[in-house]
Curated annotation (Swiss-Prot):
A GO CC term assigned to this protein in UniProt: cytoplasm
Gene Ontology molecular function: ATP binding; tRNA(Ile)-lysidine synthase activity
Described function: Ligates lysine onto the cytidine present at position 34 of the AUA codon-specific tRNA(Ile) that contains the anticodon CAU, in an ATP-dependent manner. Cytidine is converted to lysidine, thus changing the amino acid specificity of the tRNA from methionine to isoleucine.
Binding site for ATP: S18, G19, G20, L21, D22, S23
Enzyme Commission number(s) of this protein: 6.3.4.19
Compartmental location: Cytoplasm
Swiss-Prot/TrEMBL catalytic activity: cytidine(34) in tRNA(Ile2) + L-lysine + ATP = lysidine(34) in tRNA(Ile2) + AMP + diphosphate + H(+)
Protein name (record): tRNA(Ile)-lysidine synthase
Organism for this UniProt entry: Pseudomonas putida (strain ATCC 47054 / DSM 6125 / CFBP 8728 / NCIMB 11950 / KT2440)
Length: 427
């Protein structure tokens, strides 16, 4: 039913095991394969969302199935954040847990099938999704340090049910799956049966259409990569790891190509905004030269500074803590929420500390005398959002050096700053 050869060299195979029909069939197929072939260790993960009382009994059911299949089970309890979409919040919590489990190269198998593919296309059409939303669920994609794989996409729900019955498998029927207040359940229970009665191949054709849309998206992604190769040039060397694009290169593109390039770039960093919220790009792009526009997105924000747009997320969304003593400057100093610093060069006196700008700082620059730090940062074209978190090296009240700016140093040393992680939390 499925081909597992591409993933035989993975360190570990995991199965997202809800206990329902799809994941039970998937776990059985993998367990049977592992019993008869050399393969990576197989483990199951059950996510307990705590959203309904019936779910409290599901871990025990899953444990019994796993014991029967001789598969190790890990049960993870998650907190689902309240919001407009309970379905989306539960999905976010679930995939965040999966990302935490997966190590480098690990594979997470999930049980989505052809009917899921069709329902997803119809659901997103009704929401007015663009090509990226309408394209087929990929058979494989990155997830955390590993990959998510959907080996059942060519199988129908009926095919899985027939297999389960033939193998004598038992599974959980989630009562929430028949609650038609949820959009996906309404499509599955009320809409798709009528469509299939009139067009028996509806699910298969929807899934095929999603594959065609995926091919078209692939071509647009190739175009985006070409455009981003140009827009990515010229990033300041002083700020490694901080993602940015050249605004002029984007402005040279048509509006449609701008949006296509940004969709591709942002899709690797955040959940994409809906059509209505794309007005934020125009506001950011067209703001006055002296403005400091911000486009807030689901998992971070875009800001504009010195002719570039910059992606900020994770620690970059919070201001770092205040002054921090550096008792051992021979080793690196970790800065809470702001990466770490180290000294390179001649020996420096004891009693050092790292602090951040308060305003009015002066630095003795060799050959130039005392200079106002604000003016020096302007000369160096330091982005405005960096200035409040730029590590400053002090000896007592004397400013000795500014991180990552070799010209701004009083002592015979350099202060190297490893920037904080620009965290990405995509599912």
């Amino acid at each position: 039913m499925i081909n597992l050869t591409p993933w035989l060299n993975a360190p570990t195979w995991y199965v997202a095991f809800s206990g329902g029909l799809d994941s039970t069939v998937l776990l059985h197929l993998l367990a049977e394969y592992a019993r008869n072939h050399a393969s990576p260790p197989l483990r199951a993960i059950h996510i307990h969302h705590g959203l309904q009382a019936a779910a409290d009994a599901w871990p025990a059911h899953c444990q019994a199935i796993c014991d029967n299949f001789d598969v190790e089970l890990q049960v993870i309890h998650v907190q689902v954040s309240p919001g407009a979409s309970l379905e989306q919040a539960a999905r976010d919590a679930r995939y965040a847990a999966f990302r935490q489990v997966l190590g480098p190269g690990d594979i997470l198998f999930t049980g989505q099938h052809r009917d899921d593919q069709a329902e997803t296309l119809l659901f997103r059409l009704l929401r007015g999704a663009g090509l990226r939303g309408l394209a087929a669920m990929p058979g494989q994609r990155a997830l955390g340090q590993g990959s998510l794989v959907r080996p059942l996409l060519a199988c129908s729900r009926q095919h899985l049910q027939e297999y389960a019955q033939a193998q004598g498998l038992t599974w959980i029927e989630d009562p929430s799956n028949v609650d038609t207040q949820f959009a996906r359940n309404y499509l599955r229970g009320e809409v798709m049966p009528h469509l299939q009665q009139r067009w028996p191949q509806a699910s298969q054709n929807f899934a095929r259409a999603a594959e065609h849309l995926g091919e078209a998206l692939g071509l647009l992604d190739e175009l985006a990569q070409e455009d981003l190769a140009l827009a990515g040039k010229g990033a300041p060397l002083a700020w490694p790891g901080l993602d940015s694009l050249d605004l002029a290169a984007l402005l040279a593109l048509s509006p449609a190509r701008q949006r296509n390039a940004l969709q591709y770039w942002l899709s690797q960093r955040t959940r994409l905004p809906d059509t209505r919220h794309w007005a934020g790009w125009a506001d950011l792009r067209d703001a006055g030269a002296d403005a400091r526009p911000v486009w807030r997105l689901a998992d971070g924000r875009l800001v504009r500074s010195h002719g570039r747009i910059w992606w900020l997320s994770g620690d970059w969304l919070q201001q770092p803590a205040g002054s921090l003593a550096w008792p051992d400057p021979d080793g690196p100093l970790r800065l809470p929420g702001n990466g770490c610093v180290r000294l390179v060069g001649a020996a420096v006196p004891s009693g050092l500390r790292i602090a951040y700008r308060q305003g009015g700082e002066m630095l003795e620059v060799p050959g130039r005398g005392r200079r106002d730090l604000k003016r020096l940062l302007n000369e160096q074209q330091v982005p405005h959002f960096l200035r409040s978190r730029l590590p400053l090296l002090y000896h007592g009240e004397c400013l000795l050096a500014v991180a990552n700016l070799p010209g701004l140093v009083q002592a015979d040393c350099q202060l190297h700053w490893q920037l904080p992680t620009n965290a990405q939390g995509l599912s």
